[in-house]
Amino acid sequence: MELNSSFWTLIKTKMKSRNDNNKLLDTWLDPIEYVSTTGSADRPRLVLGVPNALHQYFVIENLQDKIYTEISDTYGKPFEVEFSITGNKINSHIETSTTPDEVLSGSEILQAQLARAQNIQPTQPRSSSDTLNSELTFSTFVVGKNSEFAHAACYNVARNPGADDYNPLYIYGPVGMGKTHLLHAAGNHIREQYQHLRITYISAERFMNECISAIRRHEMDKFRQKYRENSDILLVDDVQFIARGEAVQEEFFHTVNSFIDSRKQVILASDRMPKDIHGLEDRSRTRLERGLIADITMPDLETRIAILRYKAEKYNVRLPEDVVNYIARISKRSIRELEGNLKKVKMFSELQGLPIDHELVKRILAHHETQSTISVEEIMKLVADHFKVRVLDLKSSTRAKPIVVPRQIAMYLIKKFLDKSLVDIGKSFGGKDHTTVMNALERVKNLQAADQDIAKDIEDLEQRIHNITRV
């Protein structure tokens, strides 16, 4: 058996037969073409062509292992695979560009971009959203390994809005990582390049409130006209809140469908994947998963240093190198925390008339040296948000099951991550005694073993805590 074009066609066919998500494979596997076979007879190298850098990045991150496994099972001998950017078209309305008009910072993988495509025709004159922040652009976003795929996806969507392969674009990650920045950056880029398009940027909570108000006032036709007929680009932040109301979720589902059917671009941001949004209907989840999903996580130390340098220059603050490293090292929770610490140092220095040095900064930010990287209240908030209850309910004495289980899980997580005493944990929950806490910990361990859904809830919460606390 030779590694040739027929062999690669066979591999793609076998992969599709094993995979239920044919939409994913149609989008990402189909465009991969056989280019050549190089290397030695003992270890041939299969060179496969991909259309562009974004495609290359996605395949390497998400499909490479599956491709290797399928080839290994079929070929049965040593081999290598190389994914080479060849510029072949994905489809008739997306072409590659080797000379983008903006050079992205970060990895070289981001430098090949998709060309613009004029594929959205509005029926009315432009009426762009006034809520876009003009300072949040691609040029002011510091790209790191944690965000390069999300950044590249947003940038390519902004250059080519409405493309089937990237609609909707769904960005997810913990709070304060830059998701909102990317939404605004995409909106600003589209507004600059496609001045005839009408852009709507809105939070899911505001969409929900307006929808509920329209239902009460019997003004749904007006509401639908605003979001479906009078807009060409829809940018929605904090999508997880859509699941709070059945009627709102229904309206949101049809709004997103209307946009996609009309080849109008939808970009969504959330703190979790669609499958992890409690209360989200299956059809809504499926619709959100049918486009492109990109995650954004906490930046590593190197990227935090780069972000801090950029912010310091923006705020005209001169920081010694040891100060930059110190602030970046202790600011582990989010980019917002990083910027907040910089502003705190700047303000203290100006008010006291003192030069910024390592000793001063350590004094200003001393609480970071002794403070846990996540607090009791923050864990409570994570659990409350996850189960759609209030922190106040967790601290109450109610024995209702929808409250008791989240309360017990919160106690378990606080014990695991903060190692607080049973007495201290009890005090945090409205003065519960240590026996109650001890029973709660035992109860959660039993639930983890007996209930897969609860085990998954705890796993998700632990991962979110890890994302906040890791360096």
Curated annotation (Swiss-Prot):
Pfam families to which the protein is assigned, alphabetical: Bac_DnaA, Bac_DnaA_C
The keyword Isomerase is assigned to this record: no
Coiled coil: none
Positions of the UniProt region annotated as Domain IV, binds dsDNA: 350-471
Gene Ontology biological process terms from the UniProt entry: DNA replication initiation; regulation of DNA replication
The keyword Ion transport is assigned to this record: no
GO cellular component labels: cytoplasm; plasma membrane
Residues annotated to bind ATP: 176, 178-180
Oligomeric form and interacting partners: Oligomerizes as a right-handed, spiral filament on DNA at oriC.
Function statement: Plays an essential role in the initiation and regulation of chromosomal replication. ATP-DnaA binds to the origin of replication (oriC) to initiate formation of the DNA replication initiation complex once per cell cycle. Binds the DnaA box (a 9 base pair repeat at the origin) and separates the double-stranded (ds)DNA. Forms a right-handed helical filament on oriC DNA; dsDNA binds to the exterior of the filament while single-stranded (ss)DNA is stabiized in the filament's interior.
HAMAP family: DnaA_bact
Family: Belongs to the DnaA family.
Protein name as catalogued: Chromosomal replication initiator protein DnaA
